[in-house]
Amino acid sequence: MGSSFLITLREGLEASLIISILLTYLAKTNRQTESRVVWFGTFVAIAVCAVVGTLVYIFVNGLNGKVEQAVEGVIAVAAMLVLTQMIFWMRANARNLSTELRSKVDGSSKTVLFTIAFVAVFREGLETALFLLGAKTETASGSSVVIGGLIGLVVSAALGLVVFKAGSRINLKAFFNVTAILLLLFAAGLAGKAVHELRELIGWETGLLITPAWTITSGAWSASGGTFYDFMKGLFGWHASPERLRVGAYFVYLIPVLISYFKSSKDEKQLVS
């Protein structure tokens, strides 16, 4: 539940911010009557994403055996790559996002307004669907993913409304930095998941790298740890008895991306100063 909540909270807020920028600019330029076009594009995108996401979920949920392992491994890799790209893209473009959107809106037709809103929400929706599939394959609990995702969407919508009302008085930089780091940890878990699934797919069952890196048999950090264990497993890819290969994949991904993320943050501060 924790991973799906974080995913929909982040993605939902990004979509909400884009729509808020569009609506605010239309209001400031006395084009309030065209706001319904933005809302129409938003709701159409949500509906299309819901249908596509449901169909893909039904397809994936019906798989088993080697095919299931292959698909889950591919989904984990795809979600990890797209999630990483999304985080670094947002960091690089967040500062100029408002200006770029306003330039697109200036003198644009209703069709263009619809397209901007639709594409923005549809992109975030597809990313969300992919990430939630990755979360589902990791937790193996569709209901917890759905519940966490719905809660995240509700909270993101509420935050988006607050941002829309408050405008530029709210600084969301800290929020996006914290969620970015948490999502990179989630992506590292997906890297480990992908290696695990693909290793099982090819039948690699023996060797030094397949030996458990550690084994915890009791307590909150064990498989019998209940809600806490499920939360850590779903959000950070934690396992009570992971093979060394899985742990290695986790850190081979995590260390370089964290270094790169903090380096880009440092470079950004130096550029500003």
What are the residue ranges of the model-derived segments?
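Multi-pass alpha-helical transmembrane bundle typical of ion/small-solute transporters
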Residues: M1-R123, T128-S273
